[in-house]
């Protein structure tokens, strides 16, 4: 048996240790996970109620077209129903795009470091991946990304806000880029953390779709909406583009539970507003800590922060793990002396920052 040669350069995704495993290994009664940018406040009570009803239908396949969710989301976004595509998390939309556009005669352009699934899925399809270094402030260098485009370029990925830095692409920068990028090149704007954004110069991206038919926006219910376990993501784009990539989507790819919970979550925007308010207060806790200790902290438009501790990240990761706090070492993210920490509740933030102060 022979697998694709280019698959040999990839490694399977390595998730962090489960909470129960950490408890057992270190003899801990309490473990707090601040590694995967999950919502520390859970999800809307309305979503939980929707799950109680839908769980009675587990013997039935889900609606493969996600019709009810499609209708509700199209109204929320003020877009046509046919301009939406749904995935098993926005990760699957990334996979669909790569399946539809990339092969061994094409290339794709990403920032670096950024969300790794763009590169991972492109490599699976045999495409060349051109990685453009982030600017010193942690944001995308769109001018350099534009210069990297050639006749074989199919897709350009913009992660905004960017994971793992939390930085964003401003309205002016994005518009200037879209005006200059060839119309034959698909621009994918990954807005997984969109709901957390508060920057005044962040672009209203959905209205741009009417002008730029080569733009696609990705969003998810996994972050602010707190439905990570149910895996519901979506893409928004020109109807013709959606129609062309739909054949690459697997049937029944979002569950009955996920669709029902997502609909209910959309109807509870008060929950989102509350989460964003508390997240902003939590971000300030980390900014104050970094300033007090003279550490670089990237200004974030997300529910996580990236802090440079000026020492090996894996050592800090292990020290926190032994204290019952799971974070993400920057060593695997392209920042070997930094930690990426999910913003928790006020109490969780206070506790982990106190531990970090002791370690420093």
From Swiss-Prot:
InterPro entries noted in UniProt: Aminotrans_II_pyridoxalP_BS, Aminotransferase_I/II_large, HisP_aminotrans, HistidinolP_aminotransfase, PyrdxlP-dep_Trfase, PyrdxlP-dep_Trfase_major, PyrdxlP-dep_Trfase_small
UniProt EC number: 2.6.1.9
Record PTM N6-(pyridoxal phosphate)lysine, positions in chain: 223
Catalytic activity: L-histidinol phosphate + 2-oxoglutarate = 3-(imidazol-4-yl)-2-oxopropyl phosphate + L-glutamate
Keyword DNA damage in annotation: no
CDD domains reported in the protein's UniProt record: AAT_like
CC cofactor: pyridoxal 5'-phosphate
GO annotation, biological process: L-histidine biosynthetic process
SUPFAM superfamilies: PLP-dependent transferases
Xref: HAMAP family: HisC_aminotrans_2 (MF_01023)
Subunit structure: Homodimer.
Family the UniProt entry places it in: Belongs to the class-II pyridoxal-phosphate-dependent aminotransferase family. Histidinol-phosphate aminotransferase subfamily.
Stated name of the protein: Histidinol-phosphate aminotransferase
């Amino acid at each position: 048996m022979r697998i694709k040669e280019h698959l040999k350069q990839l490694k399977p995704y390595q998730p962090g240790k489960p909470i129960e495993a950490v408890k057992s290994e270190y003899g801990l009664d309490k473990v707090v996970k601040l590694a995967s940018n999950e919502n520390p406040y859970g999800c809307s009570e309305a979503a939980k109620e929707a799950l109680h009803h839908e769980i009675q239908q587990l013997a039935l396949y889900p609606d493969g077209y996600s019709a009810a969710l499609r209708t509700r989301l199209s109204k929320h976004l003020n877009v046509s129903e046919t301009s939406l595509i749904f995935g098993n998390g926005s990760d699957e939309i990334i996979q669909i795009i790569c399946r539809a556009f990339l092969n061994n005669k094409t290339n794709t352009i990403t920032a670096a470091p950024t969300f790794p699934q763009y590169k991972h899925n492109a490599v699976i399809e045999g495409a060349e991946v051109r990685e453009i270094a982030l600017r010193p402030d942690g944001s995308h260098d769109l001018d350099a990304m534009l210069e990297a485009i050639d006749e074989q370029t199919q897709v350009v990925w913009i992660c905004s806000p960017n994971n793992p830095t939390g930085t964003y692409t401003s309205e002016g920068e994005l518009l200037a880029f879209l005006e200059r990028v060839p119309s034959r090149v698909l621009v994918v704007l990954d807005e997984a953390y969109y709901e957390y954004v508060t920057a005044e110069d962040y672009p209203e991206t959905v209205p741009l779709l009417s002008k730029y038919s080569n733009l696609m926006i990705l969003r998810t219910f996994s972050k602010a909406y707190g439905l990570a376990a149910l895996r519901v993501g979506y893409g928004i784009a020109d109807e013709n583009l959606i129609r062309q990539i739909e054949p690459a989507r697997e049937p029944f790819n979002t569950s009955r539970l996920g669709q029902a919970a997502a609909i209910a979550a959309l109807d509870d925007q008060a929950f989102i507003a509350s989460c964003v308010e508390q997240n902003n207060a939590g971000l300030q806790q980390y900014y104050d800590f970094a300033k007090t200790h003279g550490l670089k902290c990237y200004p974030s438009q997300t529910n996580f922060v990236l802090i440079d501790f000026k020492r090996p990240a894996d050592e800090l990761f292990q020290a926190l793990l032994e204290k019952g706090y799971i974070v993400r070492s920057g060593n695997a993210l392209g920042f070997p002396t930094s930690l990426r920490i999910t913003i928790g509740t006020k109490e969780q933030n206070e506790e982990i920052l106190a531990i970090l102060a002791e370690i420093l």
